[in-house]
Structure formats: C-alpha cells, structure tokens
C-alpha cells in the first residue's frame, strides 16, 4: 500500500513543527541548489522561521539578485503605465476626430442654409463670403464648358458647310450629265435625296439641345 496523502495544515505540536521545519528547509535549499546547477538559473531563497531566524541560499550574491528582481518588477510596472498612457492618448485622439466630424457636419449644414440661428453676424458674413467664392468658381467652370461646347459646334458647322459645298458641286455635275442624257432620272433623284439629307443637318444642330445661341452662320442654298 502507498503512503497516505498528508493533509497540509499547521502543526500544533511545537517540537514536531520544529522538526518538520528543519527537514523541509533542508529539502528546499537542496532543490534550490539543484535548480541553479541543472538549469543554470539564478536562484535566491530566503526563509524566516517562526522564531525569526533567517536562512538563505543564493548561487549568486543575494543582494544582487534582489536588486535584479526589483528592477524587473519596476519595468513591469512601467509597462503597465505605458499601456495606460497609450490608452489615454487614443481616447484623446478619438475625441478630437469626433469633434472634427461634428464641425464638418455643422459646416455642411450651414452651407445648405440650415442651423443658422446659432451663428453670429461675423460668422454669417464669413459664410456668405465662402458661398460667394464658391459661386464664382462654379460660374467660371460653367463658362469654360460652354465655350468648349460652342467651339466644337462651330467646328462642326464648318465641316458641314464644306460638305454642303462639295455636294452642290456634285449635284451641278449630275445635272449637266443628265442634260447630256448620261444619268437616269432615278439616279438623279437618289442623289438629290442624299444632298437634301446632308444639307439639313446644320439646321438640326442649330436647334439642338444645348439651349445656347450660336454665332450667325452663312447658309448655303443648293441649286
């Protein structure tokens, strides 16, 4: 049969308690020594008996080991402080971002003409100046686009007029050939239809969807 499990509790008998202390103390010191040798660990052990007597073991200078422990403990505490500082920093940055978002939202509402009751006369004047500058930029861009569109339509007008001149020349040539009985009536009518279709394209562009007047053009008539 194996040994029964010993209940861990305070030994009431003083003699037995002292004997047990000596045995366990020696075993503990032996284990500390073995740990330092086998594992190349820095070990320091301090034991105070119930009578106040001190027993110690260290494979290094015990004071040096204690100082090393204090430093390690201090670094650990500072690490916790660093984490707290970082947490506070991110909380402050988050609050700043929320404030900036709120300011931008208020600014957008003001630009839309909303929530103006809280603004002073000076702030309203500043808002008015911002809107006027914005309108000026918008009008400038609009004018730029209109000029580009008019320029394109003018170029297209010239192209169509050149086509019209070319077709007038062709129709005159066909008429001469018809008079000489070299072109049939069917072919002549087909050419006339083609000329008419191309001739009316400039007029369609004049009344296009832009809604902006074009410069006066010289209209060429066929025939």
Swiss-Prot record:
Any Pfam family: SRF-TF
Domain K-box: 87-177
Annotated ranges, domain MADS-box: 1-61
GO terms for MF: DNA-binding transcription factor activity, RNA polymerase II-specific; protein dimerization activity; RNA polymerase II cis-regulatory region sequence-specific DNA binding
InterPro entries: MADS-box/MEF2_TF (IPR050142), MEF2-like_N (IPR033896), TF_Kbox (IPR002487), TF_MADSbox (IPR002100), TF_MADSbox_sf (IPR036879)
Gene3D superfamilies for the chain: Transcription factor, MADS-box
Keyword entries, A-Z: Developmental protein, DNA-binding, Nucleus, Transcription, Transcription regulation
Listed GO biological process terms: positive regulation of transcription by RNA polymerase II; regulation of transcription by RNA polymerase II; seed development
Expression (tissue specificity): Expressed in flowers and seeds. Expressed in endotesta cell layer of developing seeds.
Subcellular location: Nucleus
Keyword Ion transport among UniProt keywords: no
Chief location: nucleus
Function as written in the Swiss-Prot or TrEMBL entry: Probable transcription factor involved in seed development. Plays a role in seed morphogenesis by promoting the correct development of endotesta cell layer, which directs the further development of the seed coat, the endosperm, and consequently the embryo.
Protein name: Agamous-like MADS-box protein AGL11
Organism the protein comes from: Vitis vinifera
